[in-house]
Amino acid sequence: MSIRRGHARVLFNEGAYAEDTMRSGRAGAEVLRKARGQFEREGVEIKALRRCDAEGRDGTKLPACFKVYLPAPSGKFGLVFRFIRHREGLALRYLAFGIRHHPRDSNAQTVYEIAHRRLHGKLP
């Protein structure tokens, strides 16, 4: 599959994708499905990627990770990725999708906490 110039290929983990789709509610699942379709066809535009904080204020550790906001440019949802070597060069590995920031009294995990858990095997 040919990825557009200035874009990075995205590789989705089916288990993580299924978990995130089920957890995200109807609106979130629709945003995720639409983004996946676009990213698999075209890739992610490199200039849309934002570097995640290596160490977040919430205790998350996401070194060398990148994020996009959905809907662009500053939606309430986020996708977190990490670059990996792939047989066709560098690619973005999908780590997590979810709400970027919850209200202070919420116990729900943010996309950054989900990505941290998937990288490190535990919550921060």
Task: Set out the residue ranges of the language-model regions.
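Arg/Lys-rich, positively charged N-terminal/basic patches that mediate binding to nucleic acids
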Residues: 1-39, 119-124
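Enriched for short, Lys/Arg-rich terminal
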Residues: 69-124
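Short, well-structured alpha-helical interface segments that form or flank functional binding sites
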Residues: 30, 63, 76-79
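Intrinsically disordered, low-complexity regions enriched in serine, threonine, proline
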Residues: 2, 47-48, 101, 115
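A residue-level signal for beta-strand positions that form part of recognition/binding surfaces
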Residues: 7-9, 65, 91
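A short acidic, often aromatic-flanked loop/helix-cap motif at beta-alpha or helix-coil junctions
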Residues: 15-21, 57-59, 102-103
